[in-house]
Amino acid sequence: ILGLRDEKIICSSVPPYCIPLGNKVYEWLVNEFQNSDLHVIYAFSKDYYSSVASLNEMGATWALKHKWTGVLLPGFQFNQLDGCIDKTQIAIKLDDSDNRTLKYRLSEFKDELIKEFNLRPMSEATWERQRDDFLDRISTITEARARECKDTGEADQRHVPTIGQDDVGSIPVEPAFLL
């Protein structure tokens, strides 16, 4: 991701970013939270807020004052943010109706990560292609999930889960991951 080395990314249930074999999950996470300068990326959704593990990570991030960035998955609204996070902190909404704002926020985030982790910048053409491919994948997944909800008659069609452990593939996102 943007040239960040795999060993610098933790996504607890997604290989190769997962917790190393033989480790105790919570002991390992506590060690990472206490001994690393983390940047936590939240993928906010209804599913995120139903995950005890995700809420524990949110609390640890808040208590230890680690840097974080919020990403609202499609179908999740700003007024649904809850918990100990600062709800006034600007976040990225992946189904923002203002496409210019969405692209701008993603570019801001890319630039922030490049600066924070001293990564090699990429050309604008490469970035725009990767960003637009990412947004196209988000849109495709969202549309497929909306059709599934319609076909199955799922009651809450406003919440369309889009990305998570079941949809990792080339979009490495789970409820929260740490850099």
Identify the role of each PLM range.
Residues 1, 56-61, 105-112:
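Alpha-helical scaffold elements adjacent to nucleotide-binding pockets in ATP/GTP-utilizing enzyme cores
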Residues 9, 68-70, 89-93:
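Conserved beta-strand scaffold positions in the cores of enzyme catalytic domains, especially
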Residues 28-80:
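Conserved beta-strand-loop-alpha-helix hinge of the TIR/SEFIR fold
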Residues 6, 36-37, 148-149:
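A general structural motif
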Residues 2-31, 47-54, 114, 119:
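Conserved BB-loop
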Residues 5, 57, 64, 85-88:
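Short, structured coil segments at secondary-structure junctions
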Residues 75-179:
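C-terminal interaction surface of TIR/SEFIR-family domains
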Residues 13-15, 72, 95:
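Residues at the C-termini of beta-strands that transition into short coil/loop
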